[in-house]
Curated annotation (Swiss-Prot):
Protein task: One of the primary rRNA binding proteins. Required for association of the 30S and 50S subunits to form the 70S ribosome, for tRNA binding and peptide bond formation. It has been suggested to have peptidyltransferase activity; this is somewhat controversial. Makes several contacts with the 16S rRNA in the 70S ribosome.
Disulfide-bonded cysteines: none
Protein name per its UniProtKB record: Large ribosomal subunit protein uL2
Subunit structure comment from the entry: Part of the 50S ribosomal subunit. Forms a bridge to the 30S subunit in the 70S ribosome.
GO cellular component: cytosolic large ribosomal subunit
Source lineage: Bacteria, Pseudomonadati, Campylobacterota, Epsilonproteobacteria, Campylobacterales
Compositionally biased region (Basic residues): 257-276
Amino acid sequence: MAIKTYKPYTPSRRFMSVLDSKDITAKSSVKGLLTKLKATAGRNNNGRITSRHKERGAKKLYRIIDFKRNKYNIEGKVAAIEYDPYRNARIALVVYPDGDKRYILQPSGLKVGDSVIAAEGGLDIKVGFAMKLKNIPIGTVVHNIEMHPGAGGQLARSAGMSAQIMGRENKYTIIRMPSSEMRYILSECMASVGVVGNEDFINVSIGKAGRNRHRGIRPQTRGSAMNPVDHPHGGGEGKTGTSGHPVSPWGTPAKGYKTRKKKASDKLIISRKKHK
C-alpha cells in the first residue's frame, strides 16, 4: 500500500503523510454492525483523570468485529474492504449464503470476491481461513489468536502483525509472538491464517498536532517543565536535567523498569521478548 506525501505549502504539511485509500471499496458501512461506544476520555466513574493525555477525539462508531470466527463450515465471500476508525488495520465485510454479514480483520492479500471459511477441523492453508491451532502446520504465520478456547482472538490483531507456530507439546502449541516472546497456547484455540494487512501504517508520519487531537491524544507536558510540587523532575533555574534516573510523576522508574505483576500464566511463557 502506497504512502502519500504532500508539498510543503504549510509547515504542518511538510512532514505529514497518509496512507493511500485505494484499497477501500465500501462507500458506507453495514448499519447492523455499528454501535456506539461511550468515550471516557481517560476518566473513571468519579470523573477523575486516571489516564493522562486522553480526550474524546473525533466522533466515530464502533464496528462489531467477528473475532471468534465461530460460523463453522460455511463459506463466505468478501464483499467489501472498509476503513475502521477504531483500529489501524482494514476490515473485510464477509457475506454468507444465509444472508449473515460479519466483519473480520483483513489479512494481507485478501481481496473482494475471495472466499473465507472457519472450521474446527482441518482446512487448506489459505489467507483468511480460520481453524484450531492443532490443525495448522508448524511454521505457518497466523493472526487473531485466541488465548482461551471460544473467547475470541486477542493476539496479533494490529496492522502488519503476525505470530508463527513453532511446535507442539502435549495439549499446547508453541507460538512465537510479534514481540519475539515464545509461549504456550492451548491447541484448541482458534487462529486465522496470514498477516494482518495495512502493513505500511507504521511508516505514516502524523506531521501535525491536530491529527493526534482527532485521534483522542492530548499534548504531553515534560516533567522538567513543571514545578517541583508537580513532578520529581520539576524546578531549577533555567533548563536543568534530572537528578538520578527518570521517573514518572509518582516516582516509578520510567525507563526499563518492569511493572508487570506475576501471574499464574507466567508458567506458559517459555522465553521473554528479546530487547534490541
